[in-house]
Amino acid sequence: RGPVFLPRLDDDVREAVVATLTDRGVEIVTNAPVSAIENDGRRVVSGAGSFDTDAVLVAVGRKPETAALDLPAAGIATDERGFIVVDDHLRTSAEGVWAVGDVNGGPQFTYVSLDDYRIVKDQLVGDSKRSRADRKAIPTTTFITPPLAQVGLSEREATEQGVSYLVASKPVANIAAMPRPKTLGETHGLIKVLVDPATDEVLGATIFSVDAQEVINLVA
C-alpha cells in the first residue's frame, strides 16, 4: 500500500530481495491499496489500476480456534479475541495449566513457540525462573524464495538508536564456506552481520539465503 516495498529492511537487503523476485518474474506494484476484488476473484482493483489474476491471497491475520473448547468450564480465561490469557510464565488462570504457541496471543513465530516450550519446561523440571521477560532478540523469517531471516538490530535501527557497530555484508554466491546454495543452484541472496566494535558481540544479522530459517538460529 505504501511507496516502498518491505520498508523496514535496510536498503541493500531490500534491493537484493527485489532483484531476486524480479528475476523470477514477480512484478512488484507499490502505492496500490486494494479497493475491490471482482470477477469471482479473478480481478483486483487497486489505486494503481486493475490486475487480472489466477488467484488472490487475502492475508488478514489469524484467529485462535478456542471457541469450541469450552475453556471457561475449565476455569481458563480468554481475551476478547479468543486468545488464552497467560502470565509471563505462560500460566493460565487455571492451576497447573499452561498455554504455549500461537494460542496465547504472543508473536506468531515458530521461534517464539520454541521459547514457550523452554519456559514451560523450566516450570515443570527447572528452577521456574525463565519467563517471556527474558526474551531479547527474536528471529523472524519471511518465507519467500530463498527465505529472508533476521534477528537483532538492522543497520538502519542501529543508526537510529545511535549504536556503534561494524558491518559486514556479502552476496551468498561469493561465500565459499556455504556450499549448499551452490549445490542447490540457489545462489541468490546475501548475509549481513552487525557487530559491536568494543565487545565483538553480534548486534544483528540478516540472512537471505537457502535454509535461512534454520541458519538464523546459529546467530540467535
Residue ranges of model-derived segments:
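Rossmann-like dinucleotide-binding cores of NAD(P)H-dependent redox enzymes
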Residues: R1-D40, Q108-L114, V120-E157
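Short, hinge-like loop/turn segments at secondary-structure boundaries
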Residues: V13-V17, G47, T183-E186
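Short, acidic, Ser/Thr-enriched surface-loop or helix-capping motifs
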Residues: D23, D79, V86-D88, E155, ...
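FAD-site-proximal beta/loop scaffold in flavoenzymes
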Residues: I28, R43, S50-D127, N217-L218
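Short, surface-exposed charged micro-motifs
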Residues: A36, G75, H89, K192-L194
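Short, hydrophobic/aromatic-rich segments at coil-to-beta transitions
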Residues: N39-V44, S164
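Short acidic/polar mixed-charge low-complexity motifs
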Residues: G47-S50, T199-E201
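Flexible, glycine-rich terminal cap/loop adjacent to redox cofactors
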Residues: F143-A220
